[in-house]
Amino acid sequence: MAMAEFVFCRPLFGLAIVLLVAPIDAAQRHTASDNPSTYNIGGVLSNSDSEEHFSTTIKHLNFDQQYVPRKVTYYDKTIRMDKNPIKTVFNVCDKLIENRVYAVVVSHEQTSGDLSPAAVSYTSGFYSIPVIGISSRDAAFSDKNIHVSFLRTVPPYYHQADVWLEMLSHFAYTKVIIIHSSDTDGRAILGRFQTTSQTYYDDVDVRATVELIVEFEPKLESFTEHLIDMKTAQSRVYLMYASTEDAQVIFRDAGEYNMTGEGHVWIVTEQALFSNNTPDGVLGLQLEHAHSDKGHIRDSVYVLASAIKEMISNETIAEAPKDCGDSAVNWESGKRLFQYLKSRNITGETGQVAFDDNGDRIYAGYDVINIREQQKKHVVGKFSYDSMRAKMRMRINDSEIIWPGKQRRKPEGIMIPTHLRLLTIEEKPFVYVRRMGDDEFRCEPDERPCPLFNNSDATANEFCCRGYCIDLLIELSKRINFTYDLALSPDGQFGHYILRNNTGAMTLRKEWTGLIGELVNERADMIVAPLTINPERAEYIEFSKPFKYQGITILEKKPSRSSTLVSFLQPFSNTLWILVMVSVHVVALVLYLLDRFSPFGRFKLSHSDSNEEKALNLSSAVWFAWGVLLNSGIGEGTPRSFSARVLGMVWAGFAMIIVASYTANLAAFLVLERPKTKLSGINDARLRNTMENLTCATVKGSSVDMYFRRQVELSNMYRTMEANNYATAEQAIQDVKKGKLMAFIWDSSRLEYEASKDCELVTAGELFGRSGYGIGLQKGSPWTDAVTLAILEFHESGFMEKLDKQWIFHGHVQQNCELFEKTPNTLGLKNMAGVFILVGVGIAGGVGLIIIEVIYKKHQVKKQKRLDIARHAADKWRGTIEKRKTIRASLAMQRQYNVGLNSTHAPGTISLAVDKRRYPRLGQRLGPERAWPGDAADVLRIRRPYELGNPGQSPKVMAANQPGMPMPMLGKTRPQQSVLPPRYSPGYTSDVSHLVV
C-alpha cells in the first residue's frame, strides 16, 4: 500500500518540481547494432474509434518499408483519455511508461478542456518521452519550459495571425483595430501579429498598421465602452480573437452601434466564427482537418516512425524508461528523439506536416469562411501549402464574398473624413506667405488663410498663402470634394528623423520633426508643399504620385569677366606676353650685331655717296623691332646687311601672326558671350576634392541632405559641406547672390525659378538624384488613391503645365535672360578703359621724359657755357703767347736781316712780309681781330728769301735753312701776290718797335 501511494504521488510532484537528473550509466548505451527491435507507441485517445484507428495504423506501418527498417516492429499501447487529470497521470505511468513506450500520441474532446493533455505532457516530459498532440491548440503548449517534449500536428490558435496578415495584404487594408481577450491566447495572437508584421511587410508593398488595440476580460457582459473608442477611430477593419461566448456579446453590442453594417469589415478566428449571432458578411478562418482525428493519428504515427528510422541510422537508441518511481532516470535518447521529430517534413493526410522550434505545426491549411444569411458558412478562399514555391499561399475569390450590408464591393476599411487638416511651408515659388496688414480682414481671391500650426498667438496667425501648391490645392479640393484647414509649419522645416532610444532597446527608434513629424504623429492629414519623395520618408508616410518631377542641381553666381582695366590683355596669357616682350629685344640685339659685324653694314664704300644712310645702331634696332611688331612705318634705321634684313623679314612674319592671333582672341574675349558656369556639375573635381577652397552647402535635414547621406561616393563631399549647411533655402540663395556661398545644392525647381528671375544666377551641370514632389498623407490614408488619380488627370489635362508656366518660369516678372545672353556684347569704355589708360600713361611718360630732357639740357648748356668760357680764355691766352713768340721771332729775324744788310747786302734777297691774313697761325681764323697792333694795313712785311733768291724753294726748306724763322701757314689760302705794298718793298726799312707788346 505504501508503494502504491509513492507511485501515485511521484507524478503529481513532477507537475511542479524539476529534479536534477544524474548521468545515464554507460552500460545502458547500445551500439547501432544493439538498437531495440521493438518499439511501443503509446496512445491517450478520446474515444474507441480513435483507439481502433491508432492500432490499425500501427499494424499497417509495420508493412511500410519506407518508414520501418528491417527487423523493427512497432506495437501500440493505448489508454482512454480521462477528464480527471490525476487519473490520467496514473494511467500513463501504469499502462504506458511501465510498458516502455518511446512516444505518446494524445487527443481529447474539444469540449472537455485541456487539463488532461497537459497532465500527459507533464508526466511524459518528466521522463523525456516525446508527446504528439493531435487536438490541443492552446498557446501554453508552445512554452518549452513547461511542456519540454510536446509537439502537435495542429497549429495553435495564435498562428491565425499569420493568416490575418495575408488577408490584409490581399484586400490592401492598411489600418486595423485588434480586439482580443486578456488571456494567454489573446495576448499571444497580438504578439504574433506584431512580431510577424515586422518581417512580413518587407516583402509586400502594402503595410498594415494597428490603429487601436482593444483588450477585454474573458466572460464579459458588455462591450459598449470599447465600442465608443472604436467608433471614433478611423479604421473600420476589426480583427477579433474571442471565445464563442465572448464573441456573442461583442457582436450583440456592435450591432446596436451599427458597427456591423455597410462599410465595416470583421475578420475573426475560428471560435468566434461559431457564435450563433455572427453578422452577415463576417470573414473567419477554419482549420482544415481540424476534427479529423484519424488523419492526425496517422500523420503523427508516420512522423514518429520517420524520426526513429533516421535516428537508428545515425545513433544508438537507449531503451525507454520503465519505472515512474525511479527519480534518477534521464532518458537522453528521448531528448534526441524529440529533436528528430521537430525536423520532420512529410506529406500526410492533413497536408504538409512540419514543425517549428516550439514543436508547433506549420504549413497548416485554413479555409476562409464568409458568413451569409441564416448563419450559412461559405468557403470563399483557402490558405494552403504551395509545393512549387515551398510556402503557404492565399487564394481568395473576391467575387464570391458578400460584405456587411450585403455589399458586393469591398469596403474601404476606413472612415474617410471630408474635412482635412492640411500643412504647408513657405517655399518660393510653390508657397508665398504674406502677413496680413492691420486693416486687412481677409486674404485676396487667389490666397488662402494659413495660420501657424498650433500657435496660440492670434497676431502671429494672420498669414495668407498663395503660389503653385495653393492653386493645386484649390483645384484638388474641388475635384475630389473635401474641405480643409490650412496651416503653416510651426518650425519652418520639412522635417528629418532623430535616432532615439527611449525604451532601452537594442535598436534605435526614428523620431521625425517638422511637417513629417506632424503627419507621422497623426496631428495632420495631408501635406501640400514641395515635398520630395524619398525612401526615408516613404517608410513612415504615404505619397501621392508626383505632381512635379524634378531633381537636384547646383546654383551659383555667373562668373564675372576679368578686370576690365586689363581686358585687352586677356587674349594672351602672362607667359606669352613676357615671351613677346623678350623676343622684341632679343631680335633687336641680334639685328644690331648682324649689321655691325657684317662687312657690308658698318663701313661705307670708298665710292659711296656722302648721303648714304648711317650704319644701324642699337637704339635704331630696338626702334625697328617695335615698329615692325606694332605695324608702324619705319622711315630710317633699317638694317643694311643682307643677313640682318633676312632676320627682319622673319620678324615681320612673326609680328603678323602675333597681331592676327591677338586680334582674333580679343574679339572672342570681349565680344562673344561670357562663360556660363564655373562648375561642370556634381562630378566636378573641385566639389569632390575636399582640399579645394570651394564652399558648397544645402539645407539641414532636407531631402537633399538625406540624399548625400545615402550616397557613399559623396560621403567625403558631405562631410565638408555639412558644417556649411543652412537652416533655410532662402538664406543660402541670398548668400550666393552676395558671393558668400559659391555653390548651393537644392531642388532643381526652386533653383531654376531663381535663375529665371535673376540673370546673374545660373544652374550648373545636369540634374542628379532625380525624384519628384508629392503630396504627403498618413500611412493607410483613404485619400491616397483619390489624390493620386486626381493628379494624374491634372497632368493629362495640361493643368500642371499651366502651373509650371505661371509660377516656375515666372512669366509675369521673368527677364529675358536668354536673349540677353545671346546678344553680342558691344565694346565700350568699360571694356577698353585699360587701353585708354595705357595711352594716358604713354602721354604722361612722354611729358615726364621731356621735362627730364629739358632739365638735363639746361644742365648741359650751363656746363657747356662754362667749358666755352674756359676754352675761350685758354685760346686767348694761347693766342697771346703765340703772338709774343711771333713778334719775338720777327724781331729776331729783323735784327738778323738788318745785320745782314749792314754787313753785306746780298743781292737777290727780299724782305719777308708776314701778312696775317695770308699766313695765319695753324688753327687760327683769318680776320681783323687777329691783326697786329699798329699795323694799319694788317700786314707785316718781311723779306722772303725764297721769292728773291731761290724761287723754287718751298717754305719748309726755307725754314729749315734759316733757323728761327717761322714757317708761314700753308693751306687753303690765296696765292701770294708778287706785288707788295710800297711800305714792304724790298730794301724798305722801318721801325718795328711799336709792334712789341
Swiss-Prot record:
Biological processes per GO annotation: associative learning; behavioral response to ethanol; calcium ion homeostasis; chemical synaptic transmission; ionotropic glutamate receptor signaling pathway; long-term memory; medium-term memory; olfactory learning
Subcellular location, record wording: Cell membrane; Postsynaptic cell membrane; Postsynaptic density
Topological domains, Extracellular: 27-573, 673-831
Cytoplasmic compartment spans: 595-651, 853-997
Residues engaged in binding glycine: 530-532, 537, 703, 747
Tissue: Highly expressed in adult heads: in the brain and ring gland. Low expression throughout the entire brain is also seen. Higher expression levels were observed in some scattered cell bodies and part of their fibers, including those from several pairs of DPM (dorsal-posterior-medial) neurons surrounding the calyx, DAL (dorsal-anterior-lateral) and DPL (dorsal-posterior-lateral) neurons in the lateral protocerebrum (LP), VAL (ventral-anterior-lateral) neurons in the anterior protocerebrum, and two pairs of VP (ventral-posterior) neurons in the posterior protocerebrum.
Gene Ontology MF, one: signaling receptor activity
Transmembrane spans: 574-594, 652-672, 832-852
Lineage top rank: taxon: Eukaryota
Keywords carried by this UniProt record: Calcium, Cell membrane, Disulfide bond, Glycoprotein, Ion channel, Ion transport, Ligand-gated ion channel, Magnesium, Membrane, Phosphoprotein, Postsynaptic cell membrane, Receptor, Signal, Synapse, Transmembrane, Transmembrane helix, Transport
Membrane topology, from the record: Multi-pass membrane protein
Compositionally biased region (Polar residues): 987-997
Region Disordered, annotated ranges: 970-997
Calcium listed as a keyword: yes
Residues modified by glycosylation: 258, 314, 345, 397, 454, 481, 501, 693
Keyword Cell membrane: yes
Disruption phenotype: Flies exhibit disruption of olfactory learning.
SUPFAM superfamilies given in the database record: Periplasmic binding protein-like I, Periplasmic binding protein-like II, Voltage-gated potassium channels
Single GO cellular component term: NMDA selective glutamate receptor complex
Signal peptide segment: 1-26
UniProt-listed InterPro entries: ANF_lig-bd_rcpt, CaM-bd_C0_NMDA_rcpt_NR1, Glu/Gly-bd, Iono_Glu_rcpt_met, Ionotropic_Glu_rcpt, Iontro_rcpt_C, NMDA1-like_ligand-bd, NMDA1-like_N
SMART domains assigned: Lig_chan-Glu_bd (SM00918), PBPe (SM00079)
Oligomer and partners: Forms a heteromeric NMDA channel with Nmdar2.
UniProt family annotation: Belongs to the glutamate-gated ion channel (TC 1.A.10.1) family.
Function of the protein: NMDA receptor subtype of glutamate-gated ion channels with high calcium permeability and voltage-dependent sensitivity to magnesium. Mediated by glycine. This protein plays a key role in synaptic plasticity, synaptogenesis, excitotoxicity, memory acquisition and learning. It mediates neuronal functions in glutamate neurotransmission. Is involved in the cell surface targeting of NMDA receptors. Plays a role in associative learning and in long-term memory consolidation.
Protein name per UniProt: Glutamate [NMDA] receptor subunit 1
Gene designation: Nmdar1
